[in-house]
Amino acid sequence: MALDPKTAALALHRFGFGPRAGAIAEIASDPRGALIAELDRADAGQIAAADLVTSGGAVRAVFEWNAERLARDKLARQRREAAQRGEGGDPQAAPAMEAKPPAQAPNQGQEPPLPRQIFLKEAKARFDAAVGAEIGFVERLVWFWSNHFCVNADSSVMAGGYEREAIRAHVLGRFADMLLAAESHPAMLIYLNNEQSIGPTSVAGINRDRGLNENLAREILELHTLGVRTVYTQADVTNFAKVITG
């Protein structure tokens, strides 16, 4: 087959992350076939890293870490108060315990907080997947759909797990499957406040003076599926929120 470096360069730029050294020559004989081959890989779009945890595992780990941190802080506070009262120790120890440490960079010599550690591992795995991609066709699809079904990485330790479990798992499958996985994932439910949505006539809604939260329903209709210029109404949003809330 004749070499077609121009089409190869176009394929790498338009569908991937651009050409690596020697990449144009590698696929010049069949640029289209190279793209299809990346789609056909059994592990296309997947990330396999032993130190990554599921969304549920991340939440449990952070819950336990936070409980231990609060317990340590409480114990330290009790010891300071006891020392200040002269109980169980040298009263002169209190001022020393309260003395400020030497000025240094925040967290110098310490591990980052657990949520930060989880984020950094997820970010590195995502970066490595992009760098290691031969072309990057599938990885760009992952990025597109992660942006379409976005959640807030700043406020959720589940963001990395969400991308792996809802987006990567369905990136080459049916849109309906990805839609269901994304909208029902805890990261999305929390991001769009659906955990706060309560049936207004339910016992819980009446006792707590709470009602429906329409954020998720509106986002699904307005941004994730139909779009802003379609014919759904406010009544559709409200009824959809009722269905989602149960």
Regions found by a protein language model. Name each.
Residues 1-4, 19-29, 35-36, 117-246:
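Primarily short, surface-exposed interaction patches in extracytoplasmic proteins
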Residues 5-6, 21-117, 202, 206-210:
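Active-site-surrounding "flap" and adjacent substrate/cofactor-binding loops of secreted or lumenal enzymes
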Residues 7-19:
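Mature N-terminal segment immediately following signal peptide/propeptide cleavage
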Residues 10, 58-60, 140:
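Alpha-helical structural elements
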Residues 13, 105, 119-121:
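Short linear motifs at secondary-structure transitions and domain/linker junctions
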